[in-house]
Amino acid sequence: MLDLIAIRRQLHQIPEIGLEEYQTQAFLLSVIEQLCQDKPFIQIKTWKTGILVFLKGYAPEKTVAWRSDMDGLPITEETGLAFASKHQGRMHACGHDIHMTMALGLLEALVEKQSKHNMLFIFQPAEENEAGGMLMYQSGALDEWMPDEVYALHVRPDLPVGTLASNRATLFAGTCEVKVSFKGKGGHAAFPHHANDALVAASYFVTQVQTIVSRNVDPIEGAVVTFGSLHAGTTNNVISQEALLHGTIRTLTHDMSQLTQKRLTEMAEGIAKSFGLEVDVHLKQGGYLPVENNPELADELISFFKESDTINMIECLPAMTGEDFGFLLSKVKGVMFWLGVDTPYPLHHAKMSPDEGAIKQALPEIKAFLEENIED
């Protein structure tokens, strides 16, 4: 039987950023191959630094998938743990070490006997920075074993151990990176009529885009448009020739994201025209679409866990953070849910340290849920 706490601590010590998870992949493969040896109904293959484990059913009518992300973050750990990161400037500060450990625990349970339906375990690299889920899907890595349903979890620091949370709609917002460049004509501050001030135009733009949320977005759906960076000019008495803005869009549905991107682009072009400037708008959503749970499958999952005597299943509001599982859910119906890990520090914090008791508490119930899905 796997020592899941020891496994989690080993994974925690070797965090690697997206598409560089070589040591992580090697460690996972060593455990997976041990679990799957002498099991002729199981196939294993790799994709870049990711891993796919396929459990063929004896009379399959569907394929159910479980996805775990693998990568760490470029953060210097400050937990003081005896098993802290051994990789300088790298940390599992988003709980992906817990995610991988849970997946291995589920795999160990489900390889004991061949089930009726197919089961696919997806160990996915590069969730944090490269939209690895989208890359994996678009490369055709899943084509041979394309799932009909897919499930995943994410640790949540502010929920107690033994609590799971989800909803029947959107769990994570979709994110879109925005870069806008206004180009005008520089000049002396004393002669603005001989110049064309890009900074003034950019200032108008930042103010005007706030009306997208207040006047174009359905208040029930919600959205965020934030510009966290504006760079223009070099000194106090020179009019800026160029202004560069860098921001983000967060929305709870893909349709709302498309609307917000459209209105932002129209505003940038309109302001540029009114000031006689050139403008370039670059929008990058990549694979970070909203995590939109399938209502029917979410209802089944929530109802199942609410029957548990050991798990507290609650229904929650969406989070405005992003997750690349949204891309896979745009292709395959499925559900993501939160796993409470009870720590005072938030995700991506250098001191974030999940309570390992969450693994033992939740694993049997999640195993039972998957077993019901692949045996019905």
From Swiss-Prot:
HAMAP family, per the entry: DapEL (MF_01692)
The protein's annotated pathway: Amino-acid biosynthesis; L-lysine biosynthesis via DAP pathway; LL-2,6-diaminopimelate from (S)-tetrahydrodipicolinate (acetylase route): step 3/3
UniProt EC number: 3.5.1.47
InterPro entries to which the protein is assigned, alphabetical: AcetylDAP_deacetylase, Amidohydrolase, Bact_exopeptidase_dim_dom, Peptidase_M20, Peptidase_M20_dimer
Gene3D superfamilies, per database record: 3.30.70.360, Zn peptidases
Domain of life: Bacteria
Any one biological process term the GO annotation gives: lysine biosynthetic process via diaminopimelate
Keyword Isomerase part of the UniProt annotation: no
Known role: Catalyzes the conversion of N-acetyl-diaminopimelate to diaminopimelate and acetate.
GO molecular-function term, one example from the UniProt record: N-acetyldiaminopimelate deacetylase activity
Catalytic activity, reaction form: N-acetyl-(2S,6S)-2,6-diaminopimelate + H2O = (2S,6S)-2,6-diaminopimelate + acetate
Name used for this protein in its record: N-acetyldiaminopimelate deacetylase
Swiss-Prot/TrEMBL keywords: Amino-acid biosynthesis, Diaminopimelate biosynthesis, Hydrolase, Lysine biosynthesis
Catalytic residue list: D69, E128
Family (UniProt): Belongs to the peptidase M20A family. N-acetyldiaminopimelate deacetylase subfamily.
Pfam (any one): M20_dimer
